[in-house]
C-alpha cells in the first residue's frame, strides 16, 4: 500500500504516522526511529548494537526486525520502498521527523511560528521507546533538547516584549515537559509570569523551582543537604528578587539543576 509520506514523531510518546501497516515487533519500530536520526545509512552491526547493547543478536533476528520495519513502512507514492533493501539500511526521503518540522518552524523570526513549533511537543523526548539508550550516547537526545530550549527561550522573550505573557508562559511550560531541569527555562517562566502582572503565579513558579532544586539537592547519601536556594544559579535568585521589586534583571546564564 503506497504512502506518500511517513513521519516519525519523538517530541513526546513515540509515534510513526503514515505507515502501510502496524509494526508486529517493537524492535522494528525502534529501528525506524533509530534510522530516522541516522540518515547516512547504517550496517547491521551498528544498528543491532544500538538496539541491543547488552547482548549480540542473531542474523535471523536482525533480518526479521528489518523485514517487519520494511513491511510496516510500505512504499512511497511512486512505489519505492521507504526502507530499501541493502547492506546498509537507509530510510527514503519521504520519511521525515517531527524534529525536522520543529526545526523548520523554529528558524522563522515570527513568534507565532515558534508557537506552532512548540505545539509539536507532546511530552518527554522519545517517551515509550523500548530501546533509546543510543539517543543519549550519540548525542541525539541532547541536540534535540538544546534545539527546543533555545527555541523556547527565544519565543518566550519575544512574546514578553510584545506584552503577551500568557503565550510566553505556555511556551516555557511546553519546553519544560521535554527539558524539566534547565534552569534557564525557569528564569523565562519567572519573566513570563511577571509580565502578566500575576504575583501569585510568579511565587508559584519560584516555589516549583525550589521544590525541584530541593529534590535534586538531597540525595539519600548526603548527610548535610543543601538548601534549595543553594542549588540555584545566582542569576535566578537575583531575577526573582528584582521581579518582586518590579525591576527585571538581565538573565540568560546557562545553568542546569
Task: Identify the residue ranges that each predicted region occupies.
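Short amphipathic alpha-helical recognition elements used for nucleic-acid or partner binding
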Residues: 21-51, 69, 184-187
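Intrinsically disordered, charged and Pro/Gly-enriched terminal/linker segments
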Residues: 21, 37, 52-59, 86-257
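Conserved RecA-like P-loop NTPase ATPase core
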Residues: 16, 47, 69, 117, ...
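Short boundary/linker motifs that mark transitions into or out of structured domains
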Residues: 1-27, 82-87, 254-257
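Residues that recognize and position ribonucleotide moieties
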Residues: 7-9, 40, 119
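Surface-exposed helix-capping loop/turn segments at secondary-structure junctions
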Residues: 75-79, 162-165
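Short amphipathic alpha-helical interaction segments
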Residues: 57-68
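C-terminal flanking helix
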Residues: 66-77, 210
Amino acid at each position: 500500500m503506497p504512502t506518500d509520506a511517513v513521519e516519525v514523531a519523538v517530541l513526546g510518546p513515540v509515534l510513526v504516522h503514515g505507515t502501510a501497516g502496524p509494526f508486529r515487533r517493537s524492535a522494528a519500530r525502534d529501528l525506524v526511529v533509530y534510522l530516522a536520526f541516522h540518515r547516512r545509512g547504517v550496517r547491521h552491526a551498528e544498528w543491532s548494537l544500538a538496539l541491543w547493547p547488552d547482548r549480540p543478536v542473531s542474523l535471523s533476528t536482525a533480518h526479521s526486525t528489518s523485514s517487519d520495519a520494511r513491511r510496516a513502512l510500505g512504499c512511497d507514492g511512486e512505489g519505492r520502498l521507504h526502507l530499501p533493501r541493502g547492506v546498509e539500511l537507509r530510510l527514503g526521503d519521504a520519511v521525515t521527523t517531527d524534529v525536522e518540522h520543529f526545526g523548520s518552524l523554529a528558524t522563522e523570526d515570527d513568534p507565532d511560528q515558534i508557537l506552532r513549533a512548540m505545539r509539536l511537543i507532546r511530552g518527554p523526548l522519545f517517551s515509550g521507546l523500548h530501546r533509546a539508550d543510543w539517543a543519549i550516547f550519540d548525542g541525539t537526545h541532547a541536540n534535540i533538547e538544546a534545539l527546543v530550549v533555545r527555541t523556547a527561550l527565544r519565543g518566550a522573550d519575544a512574546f514578553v516584549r510584545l506584552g503577551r505573557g500568557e503565550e510566553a508562559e505556555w511556551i516555557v511550560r511546553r519546553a519544560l515537559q521535554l527539558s524539566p531541569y534547565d534552569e534557564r527555562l525557569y528564569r523565562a517562566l519567572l519573566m513570563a509570569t511577571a509580565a502578566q502582572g500575576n504575583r501569585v503565579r510568579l511565587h508559584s513558579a519560584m516555589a516549583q523551582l525550589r521544590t525541584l532544586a530541593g529534590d535534586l539537592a538531597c540525595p539519600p547519601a548526603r548527610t548535610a543537604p543543601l538548601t534549595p536556594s543553594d542549588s540555584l544559579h545566582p542569576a535566578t535568585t537575583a531575577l526573582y528578587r528584582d521581579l518582586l521589586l518590579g525591576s527585571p534583571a538581565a538573565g540568560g546564564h546557562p545553568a542546569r539543576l
